Amino acid sequence: MTTFQELGLSQEVMKAIERMGFEETTPIQAKTIPLSLQNKDVIGQAQTGTGKTAAFGIPIVEKVNVKNSAVQALVVAPTRELAIQVSEELYKIGAVKRVRVLPIYGGQDIERQIRALKKHPHVIVGTPGRIIDHINRGTLRLEHVHTVVLDEADEMLNMGFIEDIEAILSHVPAERQTLLFSATMPDPIRRIAERFMNEPELVKVKAKEMTVPNIQQYYLEVHEKKKFDILTRLLDIQAPELAIVFGRTKRRVDELAEALNLRGYAAEGIHGDLSQAKRLSVLRKFKEGAIEILVATDVAARGLDISGVTHVYNFDIPQDPESYVHRIGRTGRAGKTGVAMTFVTPREIGQLHHIERTTKRKMERMKPPTLDEALEGQQRIAIEKLLNVVETENLSFYKRAAEELLEEHDSVTIVAACLKMLTREPDTTPVQLTEEPPLAVKREKKRGGRPDGSARSRTKKRRITAH
């Protein structure tokens, strides 16, 4: 394993990296950083959670001239959440060197962003639409940019941003370095690379490694009407510390979050219709453990970098292998083991096999748990709580009362009563969920078309106006 010390980084960057607690590089960092420092174009096939932000962030910070007040690097990201998280990490990497980093994205007051742009940031991290808005207004100038990063390019393709990316790149100097990161490499992404990159070096994560070996992957074949009861039984048995439940639609996310709360779970939903303030509030509560279950759509969860997620539940099967890779990549991080469970209706088995073929990874079939098994799971949790109190708490104040109880009742009956009080019995409160139609097996789309369900609905196709 390569250490950052071996990469010949500046003292300023090394000090920042040490503050962040980094010592050894990840594979994507070990391969990408030296190439980037040599000003070579790089295509990195890597998903979120592999350390790719530092892989492009460290070279960017190294190459920024802080005495030059112009924008020198541009990172394009598909979502607001990813733009914020990337900018936060770049800020940490550049803190000692005093590199100014600014995120710009839709949903935030544009006048506030204009004021921030006047403070001369060195690095811009933004979503395609908002970057174009600022270029059109003349508030963002890119003529001094020497590095462009396209982060999660496949997701920008799925969201219909390819034309926007092409327009942005046409306003960046031809003499630049371009770094492109993508979990998958569909043809439109390859064409972007051919058109806008100069003899790029490919740093590739093999397909068999794409879904991360330390994630246990299971599927459950279950009818639509029974999915919610099965989900709550799994939650009772597995008792995840932090879990993400994925739904296919915004309506599904809202209904699932409400239904989970109705049954006594601390859950909140996140999707594109929420205000930015609400989304950030939900994410903060999830990171702090105030809620134990985050219910999310694919788009809302893109790029989320939340440590400690132990379980991912695909309540609705993902529409394509790329989404599956992104979803389960929320867990199994930093060397820890994660668990991914995918619910499949009988008519969606073909889609499951399509995902398995593409990721080159078989999911293990799991039998849907029964109500009795859910109760046993909660009993195990109650026993663990009881034993923890026995081992760690001072019980002397309670022992006299315990002795009096034992004079009147046998010990087994008393312990059973304690367990009953501590056990959260499975809740069968009726809930109402709108049924989602089964997902058909994804077919290869015709050249030039868009992936199923990914037509540009959020933004119209926009061109940059000349100045």
From Swiss-Prot:
Enzyme class: hydrolase
Chain span(s) of sequence motif Q motif: 2-30
Residues holding ATP: 46-53
Keywords: ATP-binding, Cytoplasm, Helicase, Hydrolase, Nucleotide-binding, RNA-binding, Stress response
This protein's GO CC annotations: bacterial nucleoid; cytosol; ribosome
Domain of life, source organism: Bacteria
Helicase ATP-binding domain boundaries: 33-203
Compartments where found: Cytoplasm
EC number of the protein: 3.6.4.13
Function field: DEAD-box RNA helicase possibly involved in RNA degradation. Unwinds dsRNA in both 5'- and 3'-directions, has RNA-dependent ATPase activity.
UniProt record similarity statement: Belongs to the DEAD box helicase family. CshA subfamily.
Protein name according to UniProt: DEAD-box ATP-dependent RNA helicase CshA
Organism of origin: Geobacillus kaustophilus (strain HTA426)
